[in-house]
Amino acid sequence: MNSTRRSLIRRGAALVAAGALAGSGLFAPSRVRAQGAARLPMPDVKALVFDTFGTVLDWRNGVAREVERVLKSMGYDLDWLAFADAWRKEYGPGMEEIRSGRRPFVKLDILHRENLDRIRSRFKIEKLAEPTLAELNLAWHKLDVWPDVGPAFARLHKRFLMAPCSNGNIALMADVARRNNLPWDAILGSEIAQGYKPQPKVYLVTCEAFNLKPEQVMMCAAHSGDLASAQQLGLRTGHIGRPGEGGPGTGEAEPKGSFDVVGKNFHDFADKLGV
């Protein structure tokens, strides 16, 4: 057998072997390349915007902690969590006055301060001086994030623009961002839109601020109602499970509706988005 023929036989054997391995799935370079080049989930989404209170921030324990810090040294002994719950319960009615048009827009810091006055007599703190009340109002600026937020946000920020689409005002959002090292690219939502969710302008002005169409923006929240409102306007939607966010028996472990991405927590949510 001459050398040329031997060379052809060896090459043919090598190709047959490679083909057999490829068929077995043990060696498939073209398949590996195709998998590596697979499109990421939600390729048209450029920005993630977030509900904050409850989704990103543990408002209940944070408010209770800060109120206790201020008042306990003054001799008060309240049910701190009940105080936080009562204060938060005034949140919706206060915003509804503005959403309904009965009142011009004011930012959330002002509503929180007014709502504090509404519950003072219930907890027998009517005699507190204004500087103490102002300090209590800053409890909302000193909230901590849930434990899954930091690591997951670091992953998400590698791919997406990120901002709050929150009812919180800019100063409040800036303070909690600095406290928790949140990687916001902007602070959007209520104050720039001069309204409160679920008013359509809050979602749409947030998209416009990034020069993006609604379908290029994903609203991320632990509250299905918030997501449904955004979805109706064309935003993509992501649900993050947050059972117990407002105490035992509260919060959503699962969404109440059909949304684009559903995560058990922010780690799972980042996984689903391929980051």
What positions do the PLM features span?
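N-terminal secretory signal peptides
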Residues: 1-7, 30
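A metal-dependent, Asp-based hydrolase signature
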Residues: 74-75, 81-134
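N-terminal export signals
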Residues: 9-29
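Boundary at the C-terminal end of the N-terminal hydrophobic targeting segment
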Residues: 32-36
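Active-site neighborhood of HAD-like aspartate-dependent phosphohydrolases
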Residues: 38-89
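Substrate-recognition element of Asp-dependent hydrolases with the DxDx(T/V) motif
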Residues: 131-179, 187-190
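Asp-based, Mg2+/Mn2+-dependent phosphohydrolase catalytic module
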Residues: 2, 10-16, 37-45, 154, ...
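Conserved SAM-binding loop
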Residues: 56, 165, 219-220
